[in-house]
Amino acid sequence: MHYRDLPEYTDDDFQHIDLIPFDWVHFEARDGSETTRMIRRIRESRLDLPCSVEVEKPRPGIEAVFAGATLLIFSRAYAGHHEFDTPHPFLLRMREQALQADLIVTWGNEGAYGLDRRRAIHHSPAYPPIEVKDTLGAGDTFNAGLIDAYIRGLGMAEALPHACRLAGNKCGQIGLEGLGGDIATKPG
């Protein structure tokens, strides 16, 4: 459920969470200063805990979150705001701001592109369903597919097609019930 008037989660809220049981933490980058403080807390208490950040829109101070992330997921709109109309140059520019992170940019019907920490470029095509039934949550489903693949120890070459297939499956059904099926156990 999406509710626009819900207040943003703050670092004060985040301080009450015990990070020990978590395998991964994911943020949507909305408030740069709050998200940066939360990521800093993760890095101070659980250096081993992977942390991903989705960056959809340009927002004041958002680039500050890049330094602490393990995985950065950008939108094509964000790349376009920075005057990039192709994914590779955008990813290379973002690499300058986030040397430690794997970088992903979604590119609509072309799928998604990535630049891993070894500077290897990866691509997965989109996997559109035969019939589009519901796109609500497809982006979050893509993110979940990436995180799922990474948690299972897969690299970007496997994670990108896994996430693209999962997002395509989501668009081909209404809601999230039963999403994945075989794809949940067989990435790529």
Model-derived regions: residue spans:
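Ribokinase/PfkB-type carbohydrate-kinase core domain
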Residues: 1-121
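Conserved phosphate-binding/catalytic region of the ribokinase-like
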Residues: 87-188
